[in-house]
């Protein structure tokens, strides 16, 4: 399912994407008989390397025909570029970081990709593993059906209502008219709640402003919520998006000349959402804030006729979140894998095998 061509061009443009203020990248194509048969990016994110104190080199945007020689040539080209820059491994796919689309889909190919989510041919796994790429980390996406509402909502409501009065928590929608400030508040929670996560890198102020501009056309206030105390202290946030891929599937990647008409008609019939993030600041964890945010998502889905919710990716090592998804009657429906190939003798594998949820 093609993404919007205009959005992909902006994302890859070194002059327009603020990611390149702290990173560099090179793009490679594989050709056979004058025809392109594959592509890959190689990139170095200095902000990631500084924050995580590592020397990771990254690859992304991997697409390839079912041809091991083409896949090998692409990975070797990316690896050579990274070795020249002193990286100790090639790790990915990340398009460009864990703040963007990441991982190779290895389970769940029968499901349509949701907004801001990659989809890959099943044979890509054998292409990468055939070139000596090993698992670094798995990411899970969970499915929760609205029809389970009557079974789960009483549990959430009990937790939320019992604890909210004690801590003076109130919920309000993110304000689209003040989106830049709302995105900064969102990232305040994000940076605190996710900072210890594997592969995490904080966004710069310029990246936050860029994100606000990208979100504004697609943000739906019904699915974006801020939790704060009565004195305005930020406690938590949740951000979900209607699955606009149900719209984009009919546009073949282009809004012009007439795709926007189809978009307007189709968006009213969107039946799924993707939870991009739901997080609580450390001092408000275990206070019912998360339960209140979960309840808000369920209530919004019920009002809008949303039948299916899919989470953003959750690290296989995040046991508390994976257990929470099970408690909400969720089931893991997609698995993404981040691979690595070590390049330096002193490089330590990032792989941690937990067995998954």
Give, region by region, the residue ranges found by the protein language model.
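A conserved beta-strand-loop-helix scaffold within acyl/acetyltransferase catalytic domains
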Residues: 1-33, 40-51, 173-280
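Alpha-helical subdomain
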Residues: 44-47, 249-250, 264, 269, ...
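Flexible loop/turn segments at secondary-structure boundaries
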Residues: 46-49, 98-100, 149, 209-210, ...
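Acyl-donor binding region in acyl/amide transferases
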Residues: 50-132, 251-328
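Short beta-strand segments
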Residues: 91, 143, 226, 239, ...
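Acyltransferase donor/substrate-recognition loop-hinge adjacent to the catalytic core
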Residues: 118-199
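C-terminal "cap" of GNAT-fold acetyltransferases
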Residues: 142-159, 337-357
């Amino acid at each position: 399912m093609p993404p919007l061509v205009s959005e992909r061009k902006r994302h890859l443009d070194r002059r327009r994407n603020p990611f390149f203020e702290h990173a560099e990248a090179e793009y490679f194509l594989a050709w056979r008989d004058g025809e392109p048969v594959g592509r890959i990016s190689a990139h170095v994110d200095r902000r990631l390397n500084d924050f995580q104190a590592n020397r990771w080199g990254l690859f992304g945007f991997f697409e390839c025909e079912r041809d091991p020689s083409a896949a090998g040539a692409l990975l070797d080209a990316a690896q050579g570029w990274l070795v020249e820059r002193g990286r100790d491994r090639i790790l990915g796919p990340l398009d460009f970081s864990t703040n963007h689309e990441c991982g190779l889909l290895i389970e769940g190919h029968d499901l349509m990709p949701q907004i801001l989510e990659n989809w890959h041919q099943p044979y890509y796994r054998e292409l990468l593993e055939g070139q000596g790429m090993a698992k670094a980390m798995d990411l899970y996406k969970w499915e929760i059906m609205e029809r389970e509402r009557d079974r789960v909502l009483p549990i959430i409501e009990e937790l939320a209502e019992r604890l909210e009065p004690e801590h003076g928590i109130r919920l309000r929608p993110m304000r689209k008219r003040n989106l830049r400030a709302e995105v900064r508040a969102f990232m305040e929670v994000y940076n605190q709640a996710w900072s210890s996560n594997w592969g995490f890198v904080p966004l710069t102020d310029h990246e936050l402003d860029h994100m606000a501009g990208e979100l504004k056309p697609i943000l739906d206030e019904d699915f974006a919520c801020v939790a704060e105390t009565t004195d305005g202290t930020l406690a938590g946030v949740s951000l979900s998006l209607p699955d606009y891929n149900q719209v984009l599937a009919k546009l073949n990647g282009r809004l012009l000349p007439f795709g926007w008409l189809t978009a307007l008609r189709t968006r009213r019939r969107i039946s799924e959402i993707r939870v991009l993030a739901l997080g609580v600041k450390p001092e408000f964890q275990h206070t019912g804030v998360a339960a209140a945010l979960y309840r808000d998502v369920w209530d919004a889905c019920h009002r809008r006729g949303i039948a299916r919710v899919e989470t953003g990716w959750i690290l296989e090592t995040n046991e508390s979140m994976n257990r929470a998804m099970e408690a909400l009657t969720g089931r893991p429906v997609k698995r993404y894998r981040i691979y690595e190939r070590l390049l330096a003798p002193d490089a330590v594998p990032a792989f941690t095998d937990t067995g998954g949820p």
